[in-house]
């Protein structure tokens, strides 16, 4: 079904995640008519460790979000663990960047940045998926978008920013692609309740093992969220010979059992 109520804007941003929403914010702040289209609706979740580095904290502060960020759990650095040893690496002092980060769940962070773009004057269309580019004399001048009810319309623009992620359908329509021979990673995470939810360090383990105790070419993480839970996850590289046979859910379970006593979680 086609709806002919087409739209026009100066800049069309494909993707309303932190990158797209930040682009929309700065464009709107400078008086540009900008429209952001996002396939999902907020709040929506993403697989992520939820950790914001000092550079990210600085950039979000430049966007006026310092007060909102201060409500979340602050951490001071990274604890690296492996082979029975650990090393606490505090964020260094810097003339521009703070010496702390925050842990913010993505379902909250992404909505915060998107709403901030709207407050700056950007138009945000959620539940709108960009299907195909609008091409005019060899230039990308917008997109055909589809809403959840199946209606489609064209949004034309002078400029288009493609920010819909690594698996960009819109990008593929423009001819971009991922070289299959290149390495890539996959990750899985969940949240566990623990009294250590406000630990001042995020943690990364360099000695993740599978259920049989075999070392794996990846890493594990534990990021305290400060709300009674920690974000626990594992990441794995495709360079591993048996990568495709690995069950990441089982790997996460093995890692949770590996850290259960120290982090006071119940992985059962």
How should each PLM-predicted stretch be described?
Residues 3-19:
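Beta1/beta-strand and adjacent pyrophosphate-binding region of the FAD-binding site
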Residues 19, 42, 167:
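Conserved Rossmann-like nucleotide-cofactor binding loop
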Residues 28-48:
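Glycine-rich FAD pyrophosphate-binding loop
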Residues 32, 65, 122:
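Short phosphate-binding/catalytic loops that engage adenosine nucleotides
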Residues 41-63:
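Conserved N-terminal glycine-rich FAD pyrophosphate-binding loop of Rossmann-like flavoproteins
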Residues 57, 61-111:
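A conserved beta-strand/loop capping segment in the N-terminal third of enzymes
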Residues 116-262:
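Predominantly flavin-linked oxidoreductase catalytic cores and closely associated redox partners
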Residues 262-268:
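A glycine-rich dinucleotide-binding beta-alpha-beta segment and adjacent secondary-structure elements
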